[in-house]
Amino acid sequence: MKEPDAIKLFIGQIPRNLDEKDLKPIFEQFGKIYELTVIKDKFTGMHKGCAFLTYCARESALKAQSALHEQKTLPGMNRPIQVKPADSESRGEDRKLFVGMLGKQQTDEDVRRMFEPFGNIDECTVLRGPDGTSKGCAFVKFQTHTEAQAAINALHGSRTLPGASSSLVVKFADTEKERGLRRMQQVANQLGMFSPIALQFGAYSAYTQAVSDQLMQQQAALVAAHSAYLNPMATMAAVQMQQMATINPNGIIATPITQINPITSSSGTSTPPTLTATQVSAIPATLGVNGYSAVPTQSTVQPSSEAIYTNGLHPYPAQSPVAQLDPLQQAYAGMQHYTAAYPAAYGLVSPAFTQPPAILQQQPPQQQQQREGPEGCNIFIYHLPQEFTDSEILQMFLPFGNVISAKVFVDRATNQSKCFGFVSFDNPGSAQAAIQAMNGFQIGMKRLKVQLKRPKDANRPY
């Protein structure tokens, strides 16, 4: 029988060939086991190298953690076993409360007296600014979840304290996952990114404003520069909307060239804007996005007689064969680097072209090799989900700057991910921004560990 206060443990760094019956002898010495479950991928059924363990008694869990956590390395593993409370049990987030709309004059003791009737309080802290002035909010941590819930039920919205603008707010404090998501949203807002859905399905109104609104041109530059959040078709739409001289990796605004075709309608409804071959040829040679260079534009162009929808909603109509240096193919070549990150979007683009540009077939293999950035620009990412590949971590870290390379380390014998990777930026600021935003970020059961690669690690990346 499990005790009410039993602890659920997370067990990490276990060999993938060990199942529950193999692991039980290791843990049974500390007490009776209530439940032991190896974690497997829900799609492939593959062992993920970790497990959940619950003892019948809380004391057994504490003994196992004390004796085993980072103390013993199991056969075939490079790092010692991890034994610690599972996220849902451990961090007090289900018993820590955020209290808002306090009066500025209330102290820690005032808040403690308010919450003491509901149970034993471990912590009570009023948040203050650098000058010592109260911010009008506090954190209160109870010993149990039940006590915290009782306080919420009784106090939330129940009164308006002196000096407060509205009624008292009492709720559970944000979890680390929620804080990580908020940090990501703040980064996205600072970079001026949009929701891909909003961009695609709001394309018509964006085109309508693009003729006269310079702000839309700035937004288009940011969208193209941070195109990890878009599909290639939407990026083409941004290029038409702006018709700029150059898009550089930092989103610096370039000079518009010509006005786009007016949006006309014979039935009173908007029609998708069109892009002709002549207009595309007017777009100058360089379309450099996130540090990748495009194919230089040539003057040998065969104009197309068909309208091409570029708003990310309608697929291209198939075209008859044209000259090899068709400008649309050149623009498409500049986006080839994103097909790994967007396999679904790639399917929308590829039917438009009869054959891939020859220059892509001649790309030297050495360009695909792992490259490092300058010192202070390279970061390690640990605890990646098993299914993550190079393209996933590339997509994850592109918002923070120009990525020189992104690599997930793979076991040569099994061809399975080792659950850590390496990303190189071209400047230290981007690396620090990535660490600040992504360290501790939780993906499923994984909490990322992101840290700078130091020179001493150069010959020992593991």
From Swiss-Prot:
Expressed in the nervous system. GO terms for cellular component: cytoplasm; nucleus; ribonucleoprotein complex. The keyword Metal-binding does not apply. GO terms for molecular function: mRNA binding. Keywords: Cytoplasm, mRNA processing, Nucleus, Repeat, RNA-binding. Its main location: nucleus. SUPFAM superfamilies: RNA-binding domain, RBD. It is found in: Nucleus; Cytoplasm. Residues 7-88, 95-175, 377-455 form the RRM domain. InterPro entries: CELF3/4/5/6_RRM1 (IPR034648), Nucleotide-bd_a/b_plait_sf (IPR012677), RBD_domain_sf (IPR035979), RRM_dom (IPR000504). GO terms for biological process: mRNA splice site recognition; positive regulation of mRNA splicing, via spliceosome; regulation of alternative mRNA splicing, via spliceosome. Belongs to the CELF/BRUNOL family. RNA-binding protein that may be involved in the regulation of pre-mRNA alternative splicing. This is CUGBP Elav-like family member 3-A. It comes from Xenopus laevis (African clawed frog).
